A protein has these predicted regions:
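Sec-dependent signal peptide recognition
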Residues: 2-10
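Active-site-proximal flexible loops/turns
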Residues: 9, 54, 282
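Structural motif
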Residues: 11, 60-63, 262
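C-terminal motif of bacterial Sec signal peptides marking the signal peptidase cleavage site
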Residues: 15-18
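Bacterial signal peptide processing site
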Residues: 20-22
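A cross-kingdom marker for long, charged
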Residues: 238-302
Length: 302
């Protein structure tokens, strides 16, 4: 099976619940980046955009956040959710520009629609959107079936704390930029990813989702790195995959690193919370900062 399946999971979960009595203590990727000359400091937290209601983050994370003057996130999802007109306009980016999803998906449409119907996922509204939107809907379904919800994602927890303490919020990207990445994904790759996913046993897909969450929550860097390093590129789609990878990871990570570098240069103290894969997909954020700052990984106890 082509391992490109994990692109669907990583891309959707890192880009766009369950409850239990016992606390769900997590130990996510966390780094301290400093410039000895200016005294500038940046804390970099690798986030998961979904989580559990009972998630407990280490005290060290909130202590570091409290030291900083600003929280930088990919986008302020709370502000976006409160601005329905802006959200509606951003969603238009994912609409089919010519025809409908059936035209876009061609001969794969009936099989994909049947799968979505069987999973109680299908809505006629989906027919207005490109396959990337269908993949996002499937990822949300998978997350819910695994006991995760975007209501308990790391970025939301950090934003809630920062706003409670009147911190400055910096958006490194916009919803429009993120949706455009999905819209720009080559159609052949969108269709391949979606088709491959619906042809995979659903329990296997859930297992991949749970493994991604486990690796993040335990800061299993080897597992996180392997999810990118072991990708098998579909035959004939090498160029399309390379462009998608640049848009989803490399280009964004260079921009994130530039924000950190500027903060360090100015002697600022900032807290940066972005999807964990941006700390591991080469060249990652830390690669762009190598030799320009002192980088320390912060490990947590059990």
């Amino acid at each position: 099976m082509k391992k490109i399946l994990s692109l669907l999971l990583i891309g959707a979960v890192m880009l766009f619940s369950g409850c239990a009595a016992r606390e769900n203590k997590v130990r996510p990727p966390f780094f301290k980046i400093t410039d000895p000359d200016t005294g500038g400091t940046a804390y970099l937290l690798g986030t998961m955009h979904v989580g559990k209601a009972n998630t407990v983050y280490p005290d060290e994370i909130y202590a570091a956040l409290g030291e900083c003057s600003a929280l930088a996130v990919e986008l302020d999802l709370q502000a976006l959710e409160a601005d329905q007109p802006r959200l509606n306009n951003a969603m238009k980016i994912l609409e089919c520009k010519n025809g409908s999803a059936s035209d876009f998906l061609g001969g794969d449409y009936d099989e994909i629609r049947t799968f979505f119907q069987n999973k109680q996922l299908y809505s006629p509204n989906l027919d207005a959107y490109i396959p990337a939107m269908w993949s996002s809907a499937l990822s949300n379904k998978l997350a819910g079936d695994c006991g995760y919800s975007s209501m308990y994602g790391t970025d939301r927890a950090m934003l809630t704390y920062a706003k409670k303490h009147s911190m400055k919020i910096v958006e490194l990207e916009s919803a429009e930029e993120q949706y455009q990445i999905n819209a720009n994904e080559p159609s052949e790759l969108q269709i391949y990813s979606l088709r491959s996913s619906i042809q995979t046993d659903y329990e296997i897909l859930k297992g991949q989702m749970k493994e991604l969450y486990r690796a993040w929550s335990e800061n299993d860097s080897a597992a996180l790195e392997s999810m990118i390093a072991e990708e098998e590129i579909p035959e004939g789609l090498e160029e399309e995959y390379a462009q998608y990878y640049y848009d989803m990871y490399e280009g964004r990570q260079e921009k994130m690193a530039a924000y950190i570098a500027e903060a360090l240069k100015n002697g600022d103290k900032v807290f940066v919370a972005v999807g964990a894969m941006h700390c591991y997909a080469p060249p990652d954020i830390l690669d762009f900062l190598e030799g320009k700052a002192v980088i320390e990984e912060i490990k947590f106890g059990n």
